[in-house]
Amino acid sequence: MENHLPNIFYFPNCVTAFPYRYTQKELDDMKPVDRERFKYAVFPLIKHRWCRAYVVRDNHTFKLNVETSKRLRRVAYPTLVPLVGVNAALREYVMEDGTKISFECYSYLICKRTTSLHDVDDSTIRGLVEGGNQLNIFTNSVGSVTNTVGIFGNPNPFAKVPLKSLHPSMQCKIFTSWARRVPVVLTGDTGVGKTSQVPKLLLWFNYLFGGFTDLSTLTFEVQEKPIVLSLPRVALVKLHSETLLTSLGFEEIHGSPVSLKFGNMQERFVNTRFSRYGIVFSTHKITLNTLFKYSTVILDEVHEHDQTGDIIIAVCRKYIRKLDSLFLMTATLEDDRRRIEEFFAESVFVHIPGGTLFSISEAYVKNSNDPLNRFMYIEEEKRNLANAIKTYTPPKQSSGIVFVSTVSQCEAYKQYLSERLPYKFYIIHGKVQNINDVLSDIYDNDGVSIIISTPYLESSVTVRNATHVYDTGRVYIPSPYGGCESFISKSMRDQRKGRVGRVNPGMYVYFYNVSELRPIKRIDFEFLHNYVLYAKVFDLQLPEDLFVKPTNVTRLHDVIEYIRSFDISDDVWTRLLSSYYIHILEYAKVYARGGSGALALDSFERTGNLTDDALDAIKSLNMRAKILSHKKASAHTYALRCKLLFGVYAGKVFTVYHKRPLTGYITMIAEHSFIPDY
């Protein structure tokens, strides 16, 4: 019983469930099993109404102070003797000694001395109904959307949400999984409301029932914590928090149950009146440093295998008993299900059926060239793309999204297509600062808009008038001092396809052979020092405790030994990880020393502003590379072939670009930037 969600506590999606106030007459007419549902109202009452309640006497009737607007003095609890009369109109009982007591006051006193929900009887349920009505926590299949105003202090009504994720049957499944306190893996096609609705649903459950060890024991000792939706990028934090905030009837963050956590936050994003039961939208790095401050941890975009996200999963597995619940959300399990089943001994898989609201058609445009013949393959791809946009053209006032792999390709493809097609072209990727302005121009365009983007648009921004996707099927995978281009994975294909079909029927045109799709093991292309450093902080065993293990374990051990050579204590590493970005491992030496150099370097990592102090701090690390050769790359650029002379990757040959043909040595400032050694 305790793990099943009574239908009177469904989240009001304003389609199948609405706020509702139950009368005592309705309660009397119910079957006993239906009256039992109201017992669970005791938990939100303890948290949100009775937490500030005390007994008063109002015209010879004992009440709770929260039942009246009068300023009455606290009085001693009355002695509870058998009830002999019920006045439903006045909502009060008469006890055997003639004392009058309100339904809610009686329930409050009974629950104060009761430890089992099983012992709550019909007389007590009357007061729970009255208190629950005041909190506006009950729902019914009939009602009005306007009644959602004020549930969380919201000035406007909740949004109407017809998505599958808030259907009553899915609410029950998700609640049962949440209440079991085992890891939950939530899947569902793009467009069913995983990210936009499930966190809102878990916020509702946390508001009602969070902070209690179980839902069969009565206690006024509540360990309330917020929940967190952890995301890989700041853009996602802003996007999804704004969506949830608006859907809950808020126009601003202040005083709402929503809080944001990301680096360099402006004051306008700070909620100074955040509720303890609320939801935090956080970047993975900040989540990792504050993990145990939350009751429920929700990790989104698990299929991306963001490095910090995978570390969070590893830490959660080791300390799962410190969390009330863990939700892993992903569009598809095709690449990860077996590993998740191995990694978590106990886990529940919940799938939200259905896809986007509108159908999505597909078209395949074959490239006759071998992808290994890169020049010929790309040239034909451009021609195919131009012809496909002519054939499968978005309607006026709509847009199409072209997915390419790099920022430089965005520029090249825009130039090629704009010379051949009479449409407006736009570029969106993670380095574009004014994305909202670009989107405004797209929405204001009465004609056809074509957006060229990197994988950034797979999830970071929703383009609401997008009807077509043109997918080259490629992604650039960075690696230390280099990188390579690869075909995408099945989960990335699903994400890209799901960008359309939300407000209108969609079209997905792809230019690659689906047989090329395969999982991408990102850990094999990454700097590994964060895995090692957070293993120190959280006492993880490497590589055994990692969610995804590197193929080359020797490289992992090389990193462990290199970090040991820094001679920095574990306590200092813990402090550094919670205070600095440390994009380049060697920066930790500067941060450990402290002083003005550390302050300047920290500012550089956060803002990109390279001051003289920051430059001097970096130079002190002797991060040099030898220039092996150079050649002209373009009219104004030279490619410098270099060999790294420091760190775990010493000896690696890589390429950087400069406006002049250099010889000698360079000093690396960051992974892809440098200064010449003159």
Swiss-Prot record:
Protein name per its UniProtKB record: RNA helicase NPH-II
Catalyzed reactions: ATP + H2O = ADP + phosphate + H(+)
Domain Helicase C-terminal: 371-546
Gene field: OPG084
Family: Belongs to the DEAD box helicase family. DEAH subfamily.
Annotated ATP binding sites: 188-195
UniProt keywords, alphabetically: ATP-binding, Helicase, Hydrolase, Nucleotide-binding, Transcription, Virion
InterPro entries tied to this protein: DEAD/DEAH_box_helicase_dom, DNA/RNA_helicase_DEAH_CS, Helicase_ATP-bd, Helicase_C-like, NPH-II, P-loop_NTPase
Functional summary from the UniProt entry: NTP-dependent helicase that catalyzes unidirectional unwinding of 3'tailed duplex RNAs and plays an important role during transcription of early mRNAs, presumably by preventing R-loop formation behind the elongating RNA polymerase. Might also play a role in the export of newly synthesized mRNA chains out of the core into the cytoplasm. Required for replication and propagation of viral particles.
One Pfam family hit: DEAD
Species, as recorded: Myxoma virus (strain Lausanne)
GO-annotated cellular components: virion component
Cellular localization per UniProt: Virion
Subunit description: Monomer.
Helicase ATP-binding domain location: 175-351
Enzyme class, UniProt record, top EC level: hydrolase
Residue interval(s) of motif DEXH box: 300-303
GO molecular function: ATP binding; ATP hydrolysis activity; RNA binding; RNA helicase activity
Enzyme Commission designation: 3.6.4.13
Matches recorded under PANTHER family: ATP-DEPENDENT RNA HELICASE (PTHR18934), ATP-DEPENDENT RNA HELICASE DHX34-RELATED (PTHR18934:SF221)
Principal location: virion
